[in-house]
Amino acid sequence: MKFVDEAEIQVIAGNGGDGCVSFRREKFIPLGGPDGGDGGDGGSVWLVADENLNTLVDFRHERIFKAQRGVNGMGQQMYGKAGQDKIISVPIGTVVINVQTDEVIGDMVRHGDRLLVAKGGTGGLGNMHFKSSINRAPRQARPGEQGEERTLKLELKLLADIGMLGFPNVGKSTFIRAVSAATPKVADYPFTTLYPNLGVVKIEAYSSFVIADVPGLIEGAADGVGLGMQFLRHLQRTKLLLHMVDISATADAYGNEKVGVGLLPIEQVRKLEIELERHDPALLDKPRWLVLNKADLMPQEEAQALAEALIAELRWTAPWYLVSAVSREGTWPIMKSAMTLFEHQREVAAEQRVSSR
């Protein structure tokens, strides 16, 4: 299924039914009073988060959603039936934006979350409400109110604990295959990953978390070059970023960057940080660990020496790991450390909730 993470839809709530002008007509009661009933309320439009959906692709085919109109009131004080609500299912992680005001009106983060996006109109009053001491036979009723109508932009932000950053072809998809049951496409050319992939990492029987691989970033991404920037929103909810670097990328005898992804390891780090700073600086404030991949492409001592030299040159103070995603060597300690971090984050969050009461 094609991955779609943006959609624009129109939602139209039902109008309220009109109130009725009617008079009681019974045998031997020639001058019965008003008995016109009220109109039914119009149906509303709701969004509901559904864990069984993972893309907004359905909204490419259906973009207008209408709730039912309320039924008009009738004689004998009969109220009109309310219009049926329109329920629209969306994936968990959907952000709802009012296009007219550019205001975020909802964030669907849990299965079953409901959001009212267009309220149905109230039913009109029948003429029985307008009877008075000076007007015993009112011939007036109130029409139903108009239902709300909005144009909404839906943005899907995947709910993942770990997000992977890196230039194309550094091995992010291979890493996800190594640590989870996900099977993203892997090949030796850039942009193999065209859409985000999610993998579930199981540490123990009841301990697991989700890792997301998004298309690789390239230099100039903040200006719209490449694929990765349009998917950066999926990393905004993550608790940890893994910044993957191809440690095997080296220069030839003339200093030209030839091998690997086309950038020396230190350039892979610095250029990506520049792109993040330009597009979404908040991502740089998240915990970010360096994962030096493709250590299997050189002798172990050489890989270790290159890694230590890189860390020293970067003055890197956060955790870092030397791994081979292909052979899975060194990948599992990262996952265990990540689980420890998440448990600590939960404990801190729980303490903050208690202290704020």
Swiss-Prot record:
One of its GO terms (molecular function) is GTPase activity. One of its GO terms (cellular component) is cytoplasm. GTP binds at residues 166-173, 191-195, 213-216, 293-296, 324-326. Mg(2+) binds at residues 173, 193. InterPro entries: G_OBG (IPR031167), GTP-bd (IPR006073), GTP-bd_Obg/CgtA (IPR014100), GTP1-OBG_CS (IPR006074), GTP1_OBG_dom (IPR006169), GTP1_OBG_dom_sf (IPR036726), OBG_GTPase (IPR045086), P-loop_NTPase (IPR027417). It is found in: Cytoplasm. The keyword DNA-binding does not apply. PROSITE patterns: G_OBG, GTP1_OBG, OBG. Its main location: cytoplasm. Its cofactor is Mg(2+). Pfam families: GTP1_OBG, MMR_HSR1. It is an enzyme of class 3 (hydrolase). Residues 160-343 form the OBG-type G domain. GO terms for biological process: ribosome biogenesis. Residues 1-159 form the Obg domain. Disulfide bonds: none annotated. Keywords: Cytoplasm, GTP-binding, Hydrolase, Magnesium, Metal-binding, Nucleotide-binding. Monomer. HAMAP family: GTPase_Obg. PANTHER family: DEVELOPMENTALLY REGULATED GTP-BINDING PROTEIN-RELATED (PTHR11702), MITOCHONDRIAL RIBOSOME-ASSOCIATED GTPASE 2 (PTHR11702:SF31). Belongs to the TRAFAC class OBG-HflX-like GTPase superfamily. OBG GTPase family. An essential GTPase which binds GTP, GDP and possibly (p)ppGpp with moderate affinity, with high nucleotide exchange rates and a fairly low GTP hydrolysis rate. Plays a role in control of the cell cycle, stress response, ribosome biogenesis and in those bacteria that undergo differentiation, in morphogenesis control. This is GTPase Obg.
